[in-house]
A protein has these predicted regions:
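Residue-level preference for short coil/turn positions at secondary-structure junctions
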Residues: 44-45, 82-85
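Long amphipathic alpha-helical segments
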Residues: 1-66
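Glycine-rich phosphate/diphosphate-binding loop of Rossmann-like nucleotide-binding domains
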Residues: 84-127
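Short, structured interface segments
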Residues: 66-80
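A broad, low-specificity signal marking well-ordered, structured residues that form hydrophobic/aromatic
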Residues: 49, 75, 87
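Beta-hairpin (beta-strand-turn-beta-strand) motif
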Residues: 54, 80, 92-94
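Amphipathic coiled-coil/heptad-repeat helices and related helical stalk/stem segments
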Residues: 32, 127-128
């Protein structure tokens, strides 16, 4: 996949009130950088920018762009204003932490306060 094959939906926020995200898995580091840089410099949008599922090389390169929040394999820039909701993220176990962390960064980029409860698997329902 060349950088020419990446098609960002820069009008997405206007249409559905959700920002475009860069799903890094399967892309080169250069493609991820190009996509995030294009969104950062887009004059028509000041919405949150989210890059998810970055590998170590992609994460390091994207981190150089000065994200507002970087956690796990997800980075975000230009967060939305604070919302009135606090959202709980509950994961079953350590295998789910990557997805829980991705949810945390995404929700916080959208302006929500979050809290996380981990390792609440089937054998631990009493911990709810």
């Amino acid at each position: 996949m060349s950088s020419k094959e990446i098609r960002l939906d820069l009008d997405r926020t206007r249409r559905i009130n959700m920002p475009e995200a860069v799903y890094c898995e399967g892309k080169t580091t250069d493609q991820c950088l190009e996509a995030v840089k294009e969104m950062l410099t887009n004059e028509n949008s000041s919405d949150a920018i989210i890059a998810t599922r970055a590998n170590e090389e992609q994460f390091s390169a994207l981190f150089e762009l000065g994200p507002t929040l970087a956690y796990g394999s997800t980075l975000s820039w230009r967060h939305r204003p604070a919302q009135k909701f606090t959202i709980g993220i509950v994961s079953a176990g350590t295998l789910d932490l990557r997805v829980a962390n991705e949810c945390k960064v995404t929700l916080e980029a959208l302006g929500h306060t979050t809290f996380t409860i981990t390792d609440v698997g089937v054998s631990g329902l009493h911990r709810l």
